[in-house]
From Swiss-Prot:
The gene is AAD4. NADP(+) binds at residues 190-200. This is Probable aryl-alcohol dehydrogenase AAD4. One of its GO terms (molecular function) is aryl-alcohol dehydrogenase (NADP+) activity. It is an enzyme of class 1 (oxidoreductase). The keyword Transmembrane helix does not apply. It holds the Pfam family Aldo_ket_red. It comes from Saccharomyces cerevisiae (strain ATCC 204508 / S288c). GO terms for biological process: aldehyde metabolic process. Gene3D superfamilies: NADP-dependent oxidoreductase domain. It comes from the Eukaryota. The lineage of its organism: Eukaryota, Fungi, Dikarya, Ascomycota, Saccharomycotina. The active site is at residue 30. Belongs to the aldo/keto reductase family. Aldo/keto reductase 2 subfamily. Keywords: NADP, Oxidoreductase, Stress response. Substrate binds at residue 105.
Amino acid sequence: MGSMNKEQAFELLDAFYEAGGNCIDTANSYQNEESEIWIGEWMKSRKLRDQIVIATKFTGDYKKYEVGGGKSANYCGNHKHSLHVSVRDSLRKLQTDWIDILYVHWWDYMSSIEEVMDSLHILVQQGKVLYLGVSDTPAWVVSAANYYATSHGKTPFSIYQGKWNVLNRDFERDIIPMARHFGMALAPWDVMGGGRFQSKKAMEERKKNGEGLRTVSGTSKQTDKEVKISEALAKVAEEHGTESVTAIAIAYVRSKAKNVFPLVGGRKIEHLKQNIEALSIKLTPEQIEYLESIIPFDVGFPTNFIGDDPAVTKKASLLTAMSAQISFD
């Protein structure tokens, strides 16, 4: 997304709040800890802590830049020590007494589900954390963790964060059904394809100005698939009377499931306004079907064999339909 100085960051946060925004997502390691520090300074200077929902994360190595690679085992991972020091430091940087949502940033496979959920629950009991989230973790791990938590009077995960967009739909295979089962909200990242979803007009403008794509992986060209999906997004955008491809990309994930809160970022207030525009756009079933036809997605076995949940599809699976006539209306 490019760099910003503190003044520019505060201006963007001010515009976000004035537009009605109140939830900010960050992590212990973002920008070598500066993200949490700046957010904390902004909230304090504006006296807005009570109005803001802060979501941050632990697991990532947030001290590598300071202590050096290979020397920061206690500052990363899902284990108790990592959790303890990370939350301690996040509270200090954010200049707050509590974290609204604390995420496990990613599953490291080195700490047991029981240890992680027990340790997280203690933070909730202490009032340091209000709700728990989990990010970039297999659905089976989250399911086992939530079953353990609810079976033992612990706090379960209430929101899942992961990669999902109209071009990359693996999220729909197991994550969405899992979240539906546990009543979890969804916070997808990479909704706009890491900045690669750009209309032909926007790309020509960039070329004219000597700019490439400014993405998380550097400046580069669109792939053939990204060009195709961008053209499709532009077509749907035109049907909604807008030129914003990103607004349609955001509207797509919001139209696919309940309780979807896309994570979006940007450096300019005009980008923020385009993102907000997506909140008023509701895609039709035909538009969703069209977008998904551009780059077909195979949900894989067993769903492509037994079908999805009839409560969602409103129709019986192939095997059930062979045996009985059932209405799901």
